[in-house]
Amino acid sequence: VPAFAGAAARLATELTLPEISQTIILTRTAGKASPMPVRESLEILGQSGATLAIHLSIRNLGYVEQALTPHYGADCPAIIVYRATWPDEEIIVTTLAGMRARVREEKITRTALVFVGRVFGDVKFRDSRLYAPDFVHVLRNAGKKKSRAAE
C-alpha cells in the first residue's frame, strides 16, 4: 500500500471533494540525490489547487511553505504523517504556516509524508452526483429493471 493511501485510510478522509479539489498530485521536493524538473516545481504544481501528497520533503518544509502559500494561503490545512501505517505512526494536523514549528516540536526529521489541501479543512461541500439516487449509469438504472419481454 503506498504511504499516501495508507495515511489517507488512517485519517479516514477523502483526498478529493466535489468543487474543492478533484485532483491528487504525488510529488517530492529536490533533495541531495536529484533535482526536480522545473515544470514539476511546487510553485507550478501549486497553481492547480490540487490536493498534494509530498514525499521525501520533511527537511524542506521552509521551501514547501514558501512555494505553496501564494496559492493555498498560510491557513491552508497541512497534515504531517510520520511513518504512515507503522505502529509508531504520528499524525500532526496543522497549517502551511504552522507545520515547521509543529514538526520541530515533535522532532520529526525523516520518514514523513506531507499532505496539503483544502480538502482537509472544515469545508462544506456538495455530495458527488455519482452517488445521487437519480443518477443513472451503466451499472445502476435508478431502480428501473428492464423487462426481458421488452427486449
What positions do the PLM features span?
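A contiguous loop/helix-start segment that scaffolds small-molecule binding in enzyme catalytic cores
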Residues: 21-23, 27-151
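Short glycine-cluster motifs
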Residues: 1-31
